[in-house]
């Protein structure tokens, strides 16, 4: 793909998300979602391998179904209220349909099956875009209509997503699938909280994007495709291994790292609203995710799998020996620094919530 075409597609992805964020009209909101989806498809199949194309087709089919459901909701709303305004409340039928459509776009249970396969079939950078930027537009729609949705249903789907994300990642050895199930679990945390506090959910989404960016950039820099690659990282790059451990533990939510803020402010919000059972189930579900986070950390820092010397040296490719500053390196440094020094930012986040 020519570089100019790629830049135009990236600009359209950004523009589609901005249209959704600034929309007060159902039709322009739907147009923004479609611009976002259609522009990301050529980027997903950038390398044009069979696996990339397969993932792009899966993503297109899922997003097409979701867009069709959203369009049906838009038409029903316009027919009922003779208005395209987002301020009009949803009824019971359109509320359920909108929950289903947003669940498909966000990868919530029970509409999460497509997400790990799509992430596994694309590169790390494309997977990062799907896990972070592509969540912003549907999350904005969720914020617009959250007052009309069934909060109990949304919280239940969020809890089940946390459990499924933790359970699904236990048996995985491919790093991209582990990150995909981790993303499902984190989106479950955010959706469980958004019905009780939109500001808390927005802060959680920003924190998740920062932490996930550091993990994906690091995995892309060292080409960590599986747990066996992680086990060889610390032998040749101690700093990289230590950075991966800190980023993974931050993603798992261990204090005093930045990821702890996601769990802390969510539990604080739920307890203040009297949702003690919901908070307890979320904590137990996060323990499942923490298990495979710790497994990655142990493989990176404490253990080294037995292997032949030829296998070890074949892993040391030239891509890890390039010098100079790159945009990816700058983004990695910034996101890793924030994700590692989380409690330094705690007063800022508390002031944002008050």
Curated annotation (Swiss-Prot):
Main location (coarse class): mitochondrion
One biological process term in Gene Ontology: mitochondrial electron transport, NADH to ubiquinone
Pfam families attached to this UniProt entry: NADH_dehy_S2_C, Proton_antipo_M
Superkingdom, taxonomy of origin: Eukaryota
Keywords in alphabetical order: Electron transport, Membrane, Mitochondrion, Mitochondrion inner membrane, NAD, Respiratory chain, Translocase, Transmembrane, Transmembrane helix, Transport, Ubiquinone
Keyword Transport appears in the UniProt entry: yes
Protein name per the record: NADH-ubiquinone oxidoreductase chain 2
Organism: Patiria pectinifera
